[in-house]
Amino acid sequence: MSSAVMTPPTVGASAMTDPFGRTISYLRVSITDRCDFRCVYCMSEDMTFLPRADLLTLEELDRLCSAFIARGVRKLRLTGGEPLVRRNMMSLVRSLSRHLGTGALDELTLTTNGSQLARFAEELSDCGVRRINVSLDTLDPGKFRAITRWGDLDRVLAGIEAARAAGLAVKINAVALKNINEDEIPSLMQWAHGLGMGLTLIEVMPLGEIGEGRIDQYVPLSLVRARLSNNYTLTDLPDSTGGPARYVRVDETGGKLGFITPLTHNFCESCNRVRITCTGTLHTCLGQEDASDLRRPLRASPDDDLLNAAIDRAIGHKPKGHDFIIDRKHNRPSIGRHMSVTGG
């Protein structure tokens, strides 16, 4: 980032509360739609990415995030695509970390595929990042190559080790895929818990065309949990995060296991989050086509008055819940945009 002076947050800006009384305190920002993997459940192999000129600059992303922090966001997650492939992205992390220092922000974190972690883990830790999520669906090199199409498992594992060595807490996110990795979930859990890492399982989400039918990938996590219960003691944990995951403690490993089930059990009633794309589009719901342009008001004025008005309008229309569905009759994705654009 350049040394340009950022617009200071509006002092005393009001909190963001939607029509259903949910206060927005968690912002997820996709800083790029590009990725060095082509995961089969996320995008097609010949994915066409956005022109670079369409993306917000790092300075604009900083200003946008800061405006939301001034409105009550306490947790900020940077996503992609793969956030660590964006040029100079660490300058954005370093700049945003000032909000940790002032106490305006409780947590600055990111979700990554791990491919670039060995390069950036130490710097992330130095910037005040304390924990990260790593997307990893298998420990089998052949399956990993098949799922990611372009990925190198050894490089990801080295990145995870570098993150742990830098003092970052790591949580593994794994998408459960029918007839691909569902049989490997117990061993993936044992591996993660053995290293002191949590594991969260995620159902396939119907976002964007991927060149394959998602019904052939989908396995309900209720079935996965039932299978695990045959060999492990799963004790429900209280919901303390306000997020989409439902957690259990696995008595035999002492580790924590999460289930994100948008299709079999939605998580809308306690939703406290919104998403911003790398082009400045605000999505107040992952599973709806709602969209509000924040780039125009961001660029229209050096102060945040127009931006805050646009944010208020968008939050005022946040829907009660999503419309995710996967079945043979509805084989097209429920939502046209890709997760890589929305932010994973």
Swiss-Prot record:
[4Fe-4S] cluster 1 binds at residues 35, 39, 42. [4Fe-4S] cluster 2 binds at residues 268, 271, 285. S-adenosyl-L-methionine binds at residues 41, 81, 135, 205. It comes from Rhodopseudomonas palustris (strain BisB5). It catalyses: GTP + AH2 + S-adenosyl-L-methionine = (8S)-3',8-cyclo-7,8-dihydroguanosine 5'-triphosphate + 5'-deoxyadenosine + L-methionine + A + H(+). Keywords: 4Fe-4S, GTP-binding, Iron, Iron-sulfur, Lyase, Metal-binding, Molybdenum cofactor biosynthesis, Nucleotide-binding, S-adenosyl-L-methionine. GTP binds at residues 28, 77, 111, 171, 273-275. Residues 19-239 form the Radical SAM core domain. Its cofactor is [4Fe-4S] cluster. Its EC number is 4.1.99.22. This is GTP 3',8-cyclase. Catalyzes the cyclization of GTP to (8S)-3',8-cyclo-7,8-dihydroguanosine 5'-triphosphate. InterPro entries: Aldolase_TIM, Elp3/MiaA/NifB-like_rSAM, MoaA, MoaA_NifB_PqqE_Fe-S-bd_CS, MoaA_twitch, MoCo_biosynth_MoaA/MoaC, rSAM. One of its GO terms (molecular function) is GTP binding. Belongs to the radical SAM superfamily. MoaA family. Binds 2 [4Fe-4S] clusters. Binds 1 [4Fe-4S] cluster coordinated with 3 cysteines and an exchangeable S-adenosyl-L-methionine and 1 [4Fe-4S] cluster coordinated with 3 cysteines and the GTP-derived substrate. Monomer and homodimer. Pathway: Cofactor biosynthesis; molybdopterin biosynthesis. One of its GO terms (biological process) is Mo-molybdopterin cofactor biosynthetic process. It holds the Pfam family Fer4_12.
